[in-house]
Amino acid sequence: MDGFQDSLGQICGSFVICTHELIIQYLVIGDLMLKAIIKREILEYLKSSKFLIGLCLTIILVGMSTFINIGDYQQRQQDYLDATQNLQEQFGVKIFRKPQVLSTLVQGRDRELGSQIEISFLRLPIQTSGYMGEFASQHHRYVSGFTSVDFAFVVRVVLSLMVIFLAYNSVSEETAQGTLRLSMANALPRGQLLFGKFIGGLFVILACLTIATLVAVLVMVLHPAIMLDSETCLRILGMWMISALYLGVFFTLSLIVSTIFNRPSIGLLVLLQVWIVVNVIYPNVSVILSQQLIRLPGQEELEDRKRALFEPFQRQFSETQEAFTKMVKSSDIDMELSKKNVDVNAQRTELYHRIDSEYSRQLTRQMHFARNIGLLSPSVLYDSIVQRIAGTDIREFDKFMEGVERHWYKDTERAKLMYTDYKAYQEYKMPEFTYSTQSAVESLVYTLPESIVLFLLSVFFFVGAHTVFMRKNIG
């Protein structure tokens, strides 16, 4: 009995050892097979003329656009410095908006929304002037499409198309040529083959994106007008990560299309149609829908609202204006009347600004609605995220305008001080204009939900490709 137990123990021990060795051998072989697939895919991509053409075009476009945009940024920065240094004591206050350094990579709305604004107790506009001209931002604020060539444009258009042309036949071409059937005949796991194709293709795409990013950074570093600090570098790193997620969406989309269609030409046609819809047609349709669903008041309606809001104070305003005009003509200074003149004009300016601010908020709601409709478009998500990280989106401008409004109240109080305590008025120094901005970390955290959506799109497409490929009849 003891001998039987010993023999049984030896058999079980031998079985466990053999099983362990087989598992290790399978994992080693599987690991070697996966490495071989990845290596083969990388070499195939690198030898492709499509990759070489796309890479060269990307490097040229990124280098040239970054250099040109730096020149534009340098001019705007010099205009800003000249304007702030030449400020003199005068009626009203001029406020200048500093250009964003990362507008060289992601122009966004930085240039379109103007650079300067002049305020006084008589005037508090809701738009800036400069660059595009006063009120030009109303026409450019929510335009969707290819408005400028920069790093973001190259990623959004050129690199995404390059990814499609590289990956559209990653599975279908092998199916058409019969090489996929031979691979399956050698007991190569389907999931491992698809995963190897995914890793190999993703490596090449990320390498191309990294080269493009390094070219842009190199141009910025070598240019004397650009100073890169740790905050800016962190933002650039965040933009690289978002660009990788964006390109990953089109790569996994190409994989699933390539597994569904056996003919590469059909797959390419489908992918190009999808690209045109999600990158061009759908974003512009979302803007048109938002304009139709959220109607904005016309200029005449705004003027009517202003008159109606100010109607209770119109009589007092007219009487004060008439008395103040007579005082000016008579050259007799009445401090109380002068202060009252400032009060009634500031009151009218503030009430009018309420109407203008409401109109501006409606514009913002329209933009947010268009963006929410367009969230299914990877390009809309990508633009929204990188503009927020670069500080060139509409929210940055809105923060600037909030700072302008706060500064207006300070300037109005200073104007009143002239007629109550002139000595204090002369000694009073207007505080430097400031407005709150988001740090790089705050911007990345704020855009995290949209970044997760891009990641989930890639996961969804890859899982779909895996499911289709596992059930595909290779023949």
Residue ranges and their predicted role:
Residues K50, D150, V154, V158-L159, ...:
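Selective transmembrane-helix segments that form parts of the transport pathway or gating/packing helices
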Residues L237-I260, L457, F461-F462:
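Hydrophobic alpha-helical transmembrane segments of polytopic membrane proteins
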Residues V215-W240:
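Membrane-interfacial helix-loop-helix connectors in multipass membrane proteins
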Residues V163-A167, L253, L269-V270, A465:
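Hydrophobic/aromatic residues in alpha-helical transmembrane segments
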Residues G3, G9-G13, G30:
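Residue-identity detector for glycine
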Residues A36, L46, F165-F203, F469, ...:
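Helix-loop-helix units of permease transmembrane domains in multi-pass membrane transporters
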Residues C18, I23-T147, S265-G475:
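Transmembrane alpha-helical segments and their membrane-interface loop/helix boundaries
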Residues Q107-I119, T147-E173, Q177:
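Long, hydrophobic alpha-helical segments
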